[in-house]
């Protein structure tokens, strides 16, 4: 597809079109972000958005099969910046579906019985997270320590307990009283079709310029160690090295380093030393903040030993990387580029 092009004269809305007519099929994708200044970052907003999204999708379930038969699909998500509607499939059928989803999202009459069912389902899902494998719980805790929009299940459960149908309706009304809108259309549609979608959004919403909210990313100052009490026989380690800044150059460096050392980490700690059955090195990104991550779960070695073996591995990698030939380095660069 072509590079996205901003539609002219859209007022406070930002609307981008990436037209792609190469295959001649009348299909397109549409993503619409509906934003508030604070986003969905606080635990109160995050929990309410998740529950409300579930209620809307539950109410729209009767539409799913007819939409599929008509060659279109939809989804509603709740990223940090705000609610997002996504549509896909035949472009000429999307306008009607978009209107139904918009109307339901902004003005759903909450059924108390369905509210209770879906609230209980969300509570059970959060409770189940306490049973996740140790390495999963460890990485969740890392995310919670780094990102201001990531909340422990205990905090979410406490907030969820306070939510009533009336409270949720009032929260929804306040959210959609006025919103910022950013939309992207990709596929086989022209400027005129995109402008019709833009007009439809403008007629359905009260739109105001709104900067995209973003969670705070904690910058780690010196080594931080946290020991988690998890009811499991295995030991686990989540080891994170944060880049010095969130520039694209630093992220590219850590991604390349992760690409180079990940197979060696698995080979050394899993295959050769047989320290654990979950062994992985990777390059996690929190917003734009890059870094390196190491995860291992072991039925035989304590966490302190997993930490020490990871440090020994990294010390050995310093020497291996210093001795790497230009050809091997270039081959790794090309391998990573092929994956991007």
Regions found by a protein language model. Give the residues of each.
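C-terminal, active-site-flanking charged/polar segments
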Residues: 203-206, 261-262, 312-315
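Glycine-centered hinge/linker elements that transmit conformational signals in sensory
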Residues: 197-211
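M16 family metallopeptidases and their MPP-like homologs
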Residues: 24-107, 117-161, 178-186, 234-245, ...
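Non-catalytic, conformational "gating/processing" segments within enzyme and secreted inhibitor domains
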Residues: 139, 143, 165-201
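His/Glu-based metal-binding/catalytic segments typifying zinc-dependent metallopeptidases
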Residues: 1-53, 209-264
């Amino acid at each position: 597809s072509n590079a996205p092009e901003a539609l002219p004269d859209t007022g406070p809305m930002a609307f981008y079109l990436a037209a792609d007519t190469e295959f001649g099929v009348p299909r397109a994708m549409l993503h619409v972000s509906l934003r508030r200044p604070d986003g969905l970052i606080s635990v109160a907003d995050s929990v309410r958005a998740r529950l409300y999204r579930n209620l809307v999708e539950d109410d729209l379930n009767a539409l799913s099969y007819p939409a599929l038969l008509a060659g279109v699909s939809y989804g509603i998500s709740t990223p940090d910046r705000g609610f997002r509607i996504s549509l896909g499939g035949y472009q000429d059928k999307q306008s009607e579906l978009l209107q139904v989803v918009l109307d339901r999202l902004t003005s759903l009459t909450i059924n108390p019985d369905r509210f209770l069912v879906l609230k209980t389902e969300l509570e059970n899902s959060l409770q189940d997270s306490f049973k996740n494998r140790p390495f999963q719980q460890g990485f969740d805790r890392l995310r919670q320590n780094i990102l201001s929009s990531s909340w422990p299940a205990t905090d979410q459960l406490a907030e969820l307990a306070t939510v009533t149908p009336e409270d949720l309706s009032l929260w929804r009304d306040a959210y959609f009283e006025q919103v910022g809108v950013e939309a992207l259309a990709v596929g086989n549609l022209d400027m005129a079709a995109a402008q019709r979608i833009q007009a439809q959004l403008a007629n359905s919403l009260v739109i105001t310029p709104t900067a995209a909210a973003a969670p705070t990313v904690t910058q780690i100052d010196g080594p931080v160690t946290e020991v988690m009490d998890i009811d499991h026989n295995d030991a686990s380690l989540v080891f994170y090295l944060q880049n010095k800044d969130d520039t694209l150059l630093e992220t590219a460096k850590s991604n390349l380093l992760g690409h180079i050392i990940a197979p060696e980490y698995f080979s050394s700690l899993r295959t050769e030393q047989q320290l654990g059955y979950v062994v992985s090195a990777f390059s996690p990104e929190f917003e734009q903040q890059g870094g390196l991550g190491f995860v291992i779960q072991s039925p035989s070695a304590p966490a302190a030993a997993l930490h020490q073996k990871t440090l020994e591995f990294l010390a050995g990698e310093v020497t291996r990387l210093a001795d790497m030939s230009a050809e091997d380095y270039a081959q790794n660069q090309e391998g990573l580029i092929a994956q991007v």
